[in-house]
Amino acid sequence: YMKTESKPGMAPKLLDIVESLPSKVGIYYIHNEKGDLIYIGKSKNIKNRINQHFTSKVSKSIKIQKQVYTVTYEETGSELIALLKESEEIKINKPIYNRAQRKTLFNWALYSEKNKDGYIALKVAKTDGRKKEITSFASLQEGKNALFRITEKYNLCQKVNGIYDTKKSCFQYDISQCFGACIGKENPEEYNKRVHDFIQNNSFENNNMVLIDKGRTNGERSAILIENGVYKGYCFYDLNYQISNIEVMKNILIPMQNNRDTRTIIQGYLRKN
């Protein structure tokens, strides 16, 4: 058992709250004296995260330190469930200090379009509701980093995807990771097949998926259900109790809302795992 380091001057009330929290993955709820929710967050380590809120000198944290009365929490075991739950709880409860997160945060998206030479180019642009997006991002930099990894993973061309500005062949071609779309050497049909593979692997549309992850204890697993491309919810199950089919899972499912944010959170998770 490790006592949390407290900075000099942390009020005993705050210290007591920190000491009562687990060093586990989950979502936490900060309440004021009236019982109103003033902030919701998620963390890989709830205890550490609350300790940061209570010792930080930024103005939002100082307001939280003055107003906090209790902190409740829910362990999720899975980081993905914590992210999804945080997103939904903020939308429903609209806590005063979560203002920024109430709005949809993903303002950049990945789009595909055929270029003049017949190759399908992928590009990151400001979100445009009229166009069909493949996935979305919180920042332009996150989008560019993802596009870079996608281009590498699927042997696509940096020049076609607008990452490498050149009149000649792209850098990936010089090290044999691109098959020459940049200089018209690879036939567009072959190239576009790999782009379609990427889109297929990253699109939920009509897909049925069960994402299995860690549970809250060693003997437990968590599962997230996506049915026909729609995020349905999550559940926890005992390792000794096999979930043999989707119907069994649906009986213990905690239903959740499906929206653009949940789709983006799940896609981001799939990209990284």
Spans of features found by a protein language model:
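Acidic, glycine-enriched active-site microenvironments
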Residues: 1-273
